[in-house]
């Protein structure tokens, strides 16, 4: 598990509001799974399979119908239960797909000011290297900074550790 956090200030424009600087965090996880890239792609590119990899204590559900495969322009709606906030809607858009190699999802509505998640696969000796690279920023200025320090960072790390273990279990055979 390789998790890193970097602090980068970027200028964002939210729905026509004045530009502002935000602190962007980066979470990076890599893992090698003992499976062919095409088999792993067939799993990670199916929206329904998102239900297979969150921790059991994380309340997460996909809302509505979803297609068999992710494609550029696809909007996916979820409900996520966040401590102290309750059920929160989350809408992501698949912005980019390179079939069999990678895709990028970006939050459109949800708990973050910024959420960009790049999923990529690379054939390596012994299987497939899967990389999750997430760039995210929290709203609420100093309060967001405090919540990141107190629980958001650890919660994300825990979610991705569980996801790593779930994928190892799914593809261990």
Label for each model-derived stretch:
Residues 104-158:
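Beta-strand/loop substructures that line and gate deep hydrophobic ligand-binding cavities in soluble
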Residues 40-44, 50, 76-78, 94, ...:
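Hydrophobic pocket/interface hotspot
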Residues 158-166:
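A non-catalytic, amphipathic alpha-helix used as a structural packing/dimerization or gating element
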Residues 4-9, 13, 20:
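Short, positively charged and aromatic/hydrophobic N-terminal segments
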Residues 26-28, 87-91, 113-117:
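Short, surface-exposed coil-to-beta transition loops
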Residues 33-35, 80-84, 96, 111, ...:
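Beta-strand elements of well-folded, non-transmembrane domains
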């Amino acid at each position: 598990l390789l998790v890193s956090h970097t602090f980068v200030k970027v200028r964002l424009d939210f729905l026509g509001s004045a530009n502002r600087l935000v602190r962007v965090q980066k979470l990076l996880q890599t893992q090698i799974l003992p499976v062919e890239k095409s088999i792993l792609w067939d799993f990670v590119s199916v929206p329904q399979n998102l239900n297979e990899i969150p921790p059991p204590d994380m309340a997460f559900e996909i809302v509505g119908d979803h297609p068999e495969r992710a494609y550029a322009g696809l909007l996916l709606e979820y409900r996520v239960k966040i401590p102290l906030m309750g059920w929160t809607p989350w809408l992501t858009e698949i912005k980019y797909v390179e079939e069999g190699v990678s895709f990028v999802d970006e939050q459109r509505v949800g708990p973050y000011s910024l959420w960009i998640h790049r999923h990529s696969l690379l054939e390596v000796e012994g299987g497939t290297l899967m990389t999750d690279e997430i760039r995210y920023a929290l709203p609420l200025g100093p309060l967001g900074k405090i919540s990141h320090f107190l629980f958001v960072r650890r919660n994300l790390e825990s979610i991705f550790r569980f996801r790593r273990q779930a994928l190892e279990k799914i593809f261990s055979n």
